[in-house]
Structures are given as C-alpha cells and as structure tokens.
Amino acid sequence: MASKKLNLGLIEESVSKYDKKERVQLTDDVHVFIYPYFSPTRLTKMLTGFITDQEEAKGAGIKFEDINPVQWGLFSLIKEFTDLGIPSDIKNKVKWFVKLVDSEFFPLIISSFPEESMKKFGEATKMMQENLDKLSNISPEEINDLILNKVEEIENEQEAE
C-alpha cells in the first residue's frame, strides 16, 4: 500500500470527526444531538471548567461542596458534548445540573456516548486527578514545568490523531 506524506489536508480529515453531530433518540418523543468523539482540545476545556467551576461557585455563594463531583463531571461532559445549550455562568449551570441530574434523561444521555469516548474521558479525569495530587506537593516552578509538558503532550496527541 502506498504511503501518503502527512499534510494539512490529511490532518483536517483526521480531526473532522470531532465536528460531527449525531442525533440520539432518548425516548419515543425526545432526542438530543451529541458530539460522539471527544477532541483533546474540548476535553481539556471541559476539565479546566470542572476545576474553575468550584471557585466560581464559591464566589457566587453556591455551596459547591454539596454537589457530587462524579455527577458534576458527567454533567460537564454533557454540557461540552451535546447541543443542549447549557449556560456557562455558574448560577444557571448549577440550576441546569440540579434539574438534569434528577431527570430520566441524565443517564440516557451519558449512555449514548460511545464506549471509546467514555474511556477517553475516564483516562483524562484520572490523569487530571493524579496531576492535582502531584500539584499539591510541589513548588510553583515544578507546576509550570508540568503544565508546559502537558500542553506539549496534548499538542502531540492532536497531531497524531
């Protein structure tokens, strides 16, 4: 088989899957559009939001410690990878969270994402937790080095996909 030299066209073709929306029928009369493939950039954005949401909530007087972090992580995933239009401001985001988590749709939406994408999400959250654990025990200089290395790693992953 002939090999192609890597170029921008091939890279664009490779990452185009991240822009594809898929209609998912949740019940007989309710559907949602999801982005079934989690791009590294959007996954990083979602995880960054997951961390900053806690500070924003605290600043807005919301008792964020009462929120289950696993459910908030899954809610953040839904916010980033569906077309539900969940707002970005923390007060409305928490309002959406409370309603959505209690609805029949929450588990249906989560289960509609492909297993491979959910595995990618699980690995990313595990890596984030490991990094947060490390950060609590190291100096600011070492933190900067870790961040720079992680950015480089993510950029290399994007180029490889």
Model-derived features: positions:
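Short, surface-exposed, charged amphipathic helix/loop patches that serve as local interaction elements
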Residues: P40-E161
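N-terminal "first-domain core" detector
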Residues: A2-D53
